[in-house]
Regions:
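Conserved aromatic-histidine-acidic binding/catalytic patches
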Residues: 25-29, 137, 177
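Short, mixed-charge aromatic SLiMs
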Residues: 59-64, 144-152, 210-219
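Short helix-capping/linker segments at secondary-structure and domain boundaries
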Residues: 42-47, 127-137, 195-202
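Short, histidine-centered active-site or binding-site loop motifs used for metal coordination
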Residues: 23, 124-128, 193
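Helix-rich, typically C-terminal accessory recognition domains appended to large enzymatic cores
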Residues: 174-224
């Protein structure tokens, strides 16, 4: 896996073996980014640990965004620190890699206080984490895409089962492994959804497989 180290100003390879990711500060987008990084790393190595430096974001509970409870922890053993602002030296060990996430304007978040948290998660994953979000426009796009994908999965679930498309799964996972390129991973799913040669059952299994990394509740409407 490779990420952009903001402190060194270049792409770096993450070390092999267990990975400790630490979130500094209460930034919501930093927590979402760190969660996807942790999920992606856990699929490629034996263990990935996610900790935080202080209280989680407010007013939304992180569980609403499909981020598991993140325990408080010490950054001293972290290999990656994720933050929305440059942390003080004590909060980011010299050996650690720093992922700086572009923060969300508080006014943008307050205007979306009634939005579904998973829709906001999709909106955040629709843009590179180092670039600004265009809210509420991207939230509207995310809402439409989620609705369309969930309807497709509910339809595909009525078809015979098929093995997932390993090519599409590998392409999406490779995108996430390259500086967490979530927009490219989402584009792979769009390509698969539109592929007339892929069986509905294969599409379903591939979407489910990748949703374990993206955590977008794509199976929500199956059986409804």
């Amino acid at each position: 896996m490779r990420i952009h180290d903001s402190r060194r100003g270049r792409a770096v390879d993450l070390p092999p073996g267990p990975l400790h990711i630490h979130v500094h500060g209460p930034g919501l987008r930093a927590f979402i980014t760190a969660d996807v990084l942790c999920r992606t790393a856990a699929r490629r190595r034996s263990r990935a640990l996610l900790t935080r430096s202080g209280p989680p974001p407010r007013p939304w509970p992180l569980t609403g965004f499909n981020v598991p409870d993140v325990p408080a922890g010490d950054a001293a053993s972290a290999q990656v620190v994720v933050a929305e602002q440059d942390p003080p030296e004590a909060a980011c060990p010299k050996a650690a890699h720093l992922m700086l996430v572009h923060p969300i304007e508080p006014s943008s978040l307050s205007s979306l206080a009634d939005e579904d948290p998973v829709t906001l998660r999709m909106a955040m994953l629709s843009a590179p984490y180092r670039e600004p979000l265009r809210l509420p426009e991207q939230a509207a796009d995310a809402r439409a895409r989620l609705g369309r994908w969930r309807a497709l999965l509910a339809e595909w679930a009525r078809s015979p089962g098929r093995p997932m498309s390993r090519r599409h799964a590998a392409d999406a996972e490779a995108a996430l492994a390259q500086d967490l390129d979530s927009p490219a991973a989402l584009a792979v799913l769009e390509e698969l959804a539109a592929d007339p040669a892929a069986a509905p059952g294969a599409k379903l299994e591939t979407f489910i497989h990748l949703d374990l990394l993206l955590a977008l509740d794509l199976v929500r409407d199956i059986g409804r």
